[in-house]
Amino acid sequence: MNSPAAYSVSKNSLFHLTKWQASYFAPHVNVNMISPGGILRNQNKRFRKKYINSTPLQRMCYEEDVVFAILFLLSDLSNYITGQNLIIDGGYTIL
């Protein structure tokens, strides 16, 4: 997706769909979404350096970070969480 507007609209649509599903399926099903930041893959060194310098935790997201979030949401530890967007971006979006 090359358009920031299209990305923003699609992400916002998913968030509102999540909230609707959470209210519709409650109290029997909890519905949440995950929004990971930049996941470390094969990005070039320049991109990685720029991204890392823009993130308070000073690193990119590892695949395991997303897996741990999913496991948390699947566990009883999150049984009172529904309709939420769990942002896993090392603080990138707070700056």
Task: For each feature predicted by the language model, list its residue ranges.
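Conserved SDR Rossmann-fold cofactor-binding beta-strand/turn motif
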Residues: 30-40, 74, 87-89
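Active-site helix of classical SDR
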Residues: 10, 18
